[in-house]
Amino acid sequence: SLVARCRGDGHSVRVFDLPVCDFAGLEGEPGIEVVQGDITQMATVMQAVQGISAVMHLAALLPPASGRNRERTLAINVDGTINIIRAMEANAREAVLVFSSSVSTYGDTTLETPPVRVEHHQTALDIYAESKIASERLVRQAQLPTVLLRIAGIAVPVLQDPPPVWPFTAEQRLEMVHREDVVTALYKALITPAVQGKTLNIAGGPTWQTSGHQYVADHYEILGVPLEMVAFRGQDEPGWDDWYDTIESQRLLDYQHHSYASYLEALRAEVERMLAD
């Protein structure tokens, strides 16, 4: 979606990802160049940043895989970020680096007064958040124009099996963000000079601010699953979901176009379509 958005506005795009990835719909398309490589390998990173005007850094080892091997996670998420910064400082010093971080870096804020603001201290609850905090520090120190985006959990309106245990408590504050709104935020961060040098929360906004129980109840009602079957994260286990201050990010990027209600409507339509097939 991000590539399509860039191309739709007339920008040429270079996609850099692992050789094992599926590049269908990208390779051979006008205005799209595919570079296969690994961010832990400096030579291919140097090749990837040649002649670019902006970099969207999305590459990372994500949970749950990131929790299995700390060294591998830090090698990819932190050392990979170092390689991108060094390559840009050497070959693309005028290009903007937009770094995709996470609201999980705030740690457990359940006992605090919402919303969580970007000035809030960061406390890693897992290796992934640890890697993002370390990478943010590197990005802030880079001799480049940079943007830090701390992104909330992403909601995609497609039919998925509920997880065995939802990763939040029933009472926990929860604010996610629609996938297409994330794409809009990412794209606009690349082309909006006013956001350079800033750290911004990217989340759904007031219509998405709900509780863990209500979020699950809404989904189970659409899926036709009895709410008695739900299992939430234990009360004694720390978690990072909350409500977020997105006033500045919305003012600068104008990305919150899909309300929570519209997301539920799209999900319901998807379920009805699948049942009709």
Placement of each model-derived feature along the sequence:
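Substrate-positioning beta->alpha
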Residues: L148-R150, P167-L190, K198
